[in-house]
Amino acid sequence: MDSKEEAIQLITEEKHFSDDALAYFKTCIGGRDVGVNYHVISVFGSQSSGKSTLLNILFNTSFDTMDAQIKRQQTTKGIWVAHSNELLSNVDVNPEDKSDLFILDVEGSDGLERGEDQDFERKAALFAISVSEVLIVNMWEQQIGLYQGNNMALLKTVFEVNLSLFGKNKNGHKVLLLFVIRDHVGVTPISSLRDTITTELINLWETLSKPAECENKKLSDFFELQFVGLSHKLLQEERFVQDVKSLGDHFIMKDNEDYYFKPEYHHNLPLDGWTLYAKNCWELIEENRDLDLPTQQILVARFKTEEILNDSLEVLKSKYDSNVDPVIKDKLKLIQELSVLKTECLDMYDQHASKYVSAVYLEKRDELEAKIYLKFLETITLFIDSVSQDIFLQLVEDVNSESSKEPIFSKRLSNSTEVAKSKFEDIIEEFAAAKILSEEVKEEVVKRFENDLKETSDKLRVTALQKLITRSSKIINARIKDVVPQLLSNPDVDVWDRIMDKFHSIFSSTLIKYKLDDDTYDFQFGGEDEENNSTYKSIRVAAWKSLNDTIHDYLKEDTICNILRDRFELKFRYDDEDSPILWKNEEEVDLAFRVAKEYAFKIFDVLALIKTSDNVEVVPDINFHDSDEMYEDDLGIYHSAKFSHILNEVQKEKIQIQVRRQINVTVLDAKRSMIKTTTHIPLWIYAIIVVLGWNEFMMVIRNPLFVTLTILILVSFYFINKFDLWGPVKSVAQTAAGETIGTIKTKLRDFVLEEHEKTPKIQSEKSNSDSEKVVENEKS
């Protein structure tokens, strides 16, 4: 186990925490699991007070020390850390019992090099208190009783910030403040010096601005105090070494009441955890502004430079609108005008503010420049938005141009995007080169444009992809509608095999130009594999939907009935040579009926379910249904809505009944026609007619009137039959007959009415005659 490691700079003088700290600690412990068996000691005090020398002697470290014979100056810069297992003491320690010690050498306070800038020494002191178990406060005996000399002002600030940052999280944790009084000659006893320092610290603690949760806390709740005097190193070297050994005993002798490594001082973190804790503490301390206490010069400089900044900015604003508005659409004039305004504003600030503290002057100048950039950004943004819109319009036009020399969309889009980006960056670079646009704003504007450009490119790609999907789907749909109904109109038992072969052939031929050797697809839109797969699936879904709709729309109940009836009639009415069949008897009709019926219904089950000739149901290789695979019919019965299911049981039964009725009618018609063709007048009837009608026939021939009438009748019959005028003749005959019957009915009605009217008159006259006779008889 190495007892000594070269020190590294844990925190630089520029306040950066080392990224190599954890690796250094691991190197120090050599891969051992030390757990929490380690200790952290820090030293704090004025510059050139011998802090590094004390640490090197006490802990056997190798921190750089000042050579007083050459020059008294700053030696330790920042905060350094070293590892050791050795302690100078009067006690021999077993090597296995030695702890790993990490010693922090903190840059001295009140140094000439930093002057009034006390920011780092405050933060370094606060960091040392926050991460250490023991903080050695190194001071000269003659500094005791002073306020600045013994760092009381610094400790006050550190205590206040320590309470605000870490006070509520202490949970009983304490830090040992070990005051090492150098060059103690013994005139003033240590007890007296201890009382003086303790009183000063208690009084200082009472004056602190404490947070509410620490209002009643005492100094002893956070810190324990120990005091040690060391003789003069040069004048009393032997006594000095002995005093250091006695000091080392307190770090080793655990049974000693004044043992310095008490458990309540430890942070109880493993070494890698302590490293992260230390880094977080430094970041928290670095961000805290309560430690940035400016000097009076800085306060004045800040006030005056702020005033000058505002005046300069007001002058710029007063000229801004009148100078900028007329040239806002002219890039070159706009850049020139903004540059002039910025130069005038900064020159005015420089003229009046450069006399103050340089750091503050430069800080405020940067602030003024940032405000100028912010003011300019409003105008530049308007100009850039207008330019961006023109660039995007040109991009869309170039990408969608049909006259482009680049046929592949992805390359066309990529080339157009690069042109648009380059054009925009050139414009922005002109503003940045004129220093009227900060680098941060430039990067932000370019990033925003790139985001908008990506969004526009993505939209163009999505639109083009959608067009491709739509175009491919339409092509596939049209070809499916040409092929599938034709195959289904004259189906065979292997109709579904042929339809599926056609379907896959149509799909493959449509997308063949996008297919790669590994059976994947690249639609040449510059998308990733996932986007190409999504496009392929969309086209595949559209193809399956088209096939599904075409089949299910075509194979309705009536269509299937017609297909079955046509198949029946084809087999029933025509022979194998497509010639009409003339039946001789009913047995032939019945036989043909059975054969044709079997032939017709052979295809019925094939049309009811989409399956291959191997009796395997066809299942789409992609899900394209938007709803459940069940639907409810008008009767409230649920049926499958799968692609392969054409007919349910109810529909199948309905179709069978309807087809049977239709083919039965066809058979009856066939039997009737057979009876008509077989029923005729016997030949002997014609012989009897000739024998019996011979005289009448001769009479007609010998009579010119009968001959002429017969010729007219035969000619009329010929023309009526030739031109198929039987319908009109029949209509005329029916009309004439109707007119004749109507006339006869009218005449009969008139006759009956006349008779009815005559009868009452006769009866009346007869009655009158009878009454007259009765009267005459009565008179006589």
From Swiss-Prot:
Keyword Transmembrane assigned: yes
Key words of the record: Coiled coil, Endoplasmic reticulum, GTP-binding, Hydrolase, Membrane, Nucleotide-binding, Transmembrane, Transmembrane helix
Region spans: Disordered: 756-780
Residue stretches spanning the membrane: 681-701, 705-725
Record-listed E.C. numbers: 3.6.5.-
GO biological process, any: endoplasmic reticulum inheritance
Cited PROSITE patterns: G_GB1_RHD3
GO cellular component terms given for this protein: cortical endoplasmic reticulum; endoplasmic reticulum membrane
Mode of membrane association: Multi-pass membrane protein
InterPro entries per the UniProt record, alphabetical: G_GB1_RHD3_dom, P-loop_NTPase, RHD3/Sey1, Sey1/RHD3-like_3HB
Residue stretches making up the GB1/RHD3-type G domain: 35-265
Cytoplasmic side of membrane: 1-680, 726-780
Pfam families: RHD3_GTPase (PF05879), Sey1_3HB (PF20428)
Chain segments annotated as coiled-coil in the UniProt record: 440-463
Single GO molecular function: GTPase activity
Its job: Cooperates with the reticulon proteins and tubule-shaping DP1 family proteins to generate and maintain the structure of the tubular endoplasmic reticulum network. Has GTPase activity, which is required for its function in ER organization.
Family that this chain belongs to: Belongs to the TRAFAC class dynamin-like GTPase superfamily. GB1/RHD3 GTPase family. RHD3 subfamily.
Name listed for the protein in its UniProt record: Protein SEY1
